[in-house]
């Protein structure tokens, strides 16, 4: 575990992203299991190893996923695996069975639908305030999008905070909305957050590219990769995977593997990878990770009242963490306690752009 409050986080800081990453791998395991239809004794050694590896990895993921308590990951894994299994169906056999047992399948379908409804209700009541909180965040994000249809240059936090403050100032809100309201860093819906940050038009264009890659992948029968991408798309509907470098890299690789990489050419992909590497994005992510670790040490000084020492530590971290609202609030408050009021005001004023915490 990478967090003292959670028993299971993998290499992440929270069980949610860890579960989402596992849910993205599960359909690939299922694909490699299903893609070899021959009987076991007729398989060559390499295919046997592939099938065993996919089976073991898939079973281990199925053992871990429930313990993460991530409903978003459960849904993403279920939808993507059902899609992969459906794409491997024998169409001729399915048509014969449908004509022969049509009424029975309709009854089974109705029963499965009722079970899914009960499962959805169970997942809601598992953590009801969490589910209501996300619904409220989506509502506020939609109101912010209506106010900024072409995107908000100040970022998600500033636009969300403004929309939420106006909503509560009107007085027309429910008691549960007041209870679950907070100051989130993310919208827990990558589509809404992207539309708010970059505009509705850019969001539609991005979705057009993604579904174009999926279409190419399906035409090329790359169902495992497409299933993983579908899992990521479903998980993005109620979480924040694109704020984590691991998901960004995985998402780009999946888009290229769907077939767009064959279309645009391997040399162009190599050039893009070199640009990303030369641009220092990997180094930037590493520096930010190290800065966050040092921030935890500086926070000890801040909370113990050693503000001068904390200021020196915060000053070194400022170039790497100047876009994090919580860090700016702490730094500004520490400067205020040290009597450096002008610097404190500048720091807190900048924090308003990156945090909606009142």
What are these regions (language model features)?
Residues 291, 325-326, 358:
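Helix-start (N-cap) detector for alpha-helical repeat units in TPR-like alpha-solenoids
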Residues 121-135, 274-304:
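Hydrophobic alpha-helical transmembrane segments in integral membrane proteins
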Residues 2-6, 143, 154-196:
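Interfacial juxtamembrane loops and adjacent helix segments
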Residues 1-6, 10-95, 108-121, 196-225, ...:
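Alpha-helical transmembrane segments of multi-pass inner-membrane proteins
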């Amino acid at each position: 575990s990478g967090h003292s409050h959670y028993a299971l986080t993998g290499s992440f800081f929270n069980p949610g992203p860890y579960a989402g990453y596992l849910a993205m791998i599960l359909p690939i395991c299922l694909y490699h299991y299903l893609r070899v239809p021959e009987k076991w004794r007729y398989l060559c050694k390499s295919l046997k190893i592939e099938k065993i590896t996919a089976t073991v990895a898939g079973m281990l993921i199925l053992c871990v996923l429930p313990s993460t308590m991530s409903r978003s990951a459960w849904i993403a894994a279920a939808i993507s695996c059902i899609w992969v299994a459906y794409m491997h169906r024998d169409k001729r056999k399915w048509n014969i069975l449908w004509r022969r047992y049509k009424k029975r399948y309709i009854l089974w379908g109705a029963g499965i639908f009722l079970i899914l409804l009960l499962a959805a209700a169970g997942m809601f009541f598992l953590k009801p305030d969490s589910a209501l909180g996300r619904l409220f965040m989506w509502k506020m994000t939609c109101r912010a999008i209506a106010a900024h249809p072409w995107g908000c240059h100040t970022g998600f936090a500033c636009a969300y905070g403004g929309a939420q403050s106006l909503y509560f100032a009107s007085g027309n809100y429910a008691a549960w909305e007041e209870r679950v309201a907070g100051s989130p860093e993310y919208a827990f819906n990558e589509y809404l957050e992207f539309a708010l940050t970059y505009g509705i038009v850019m969001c539609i264009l991005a979705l057009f590219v993604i579904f174009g890659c999926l279409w190419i992948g399906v035409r090329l029968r790359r169902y495992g990769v497409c299933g993983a991408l579908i899992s990521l798309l479903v998980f993005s509907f109620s979480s924040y995977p694109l704020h984590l470098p691991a998901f960004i890299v995985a998402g780009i690789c999946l888009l290229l593997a769907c077939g767009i990489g064959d279309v645009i050419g391997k040399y162009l992909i190599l050039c893009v990878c070199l640009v990303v590497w030369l641009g220092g994005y990997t180094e930037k992510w590493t520096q930010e990770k190290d800065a966050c670790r040092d921030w935890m040490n500086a926070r000890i000084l801040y909370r113990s009242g050693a503000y001068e020492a904390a200021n020196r530590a915060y000053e070194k971290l400022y170039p790497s963490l100047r876009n994090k609202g919580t860090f700016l609030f702490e730094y500004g408050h520490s400067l205020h306690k040290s009597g450096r009021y002008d610097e404190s005001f500048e720091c807190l004023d900048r924090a308003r752009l990156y945090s909606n915490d009142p």
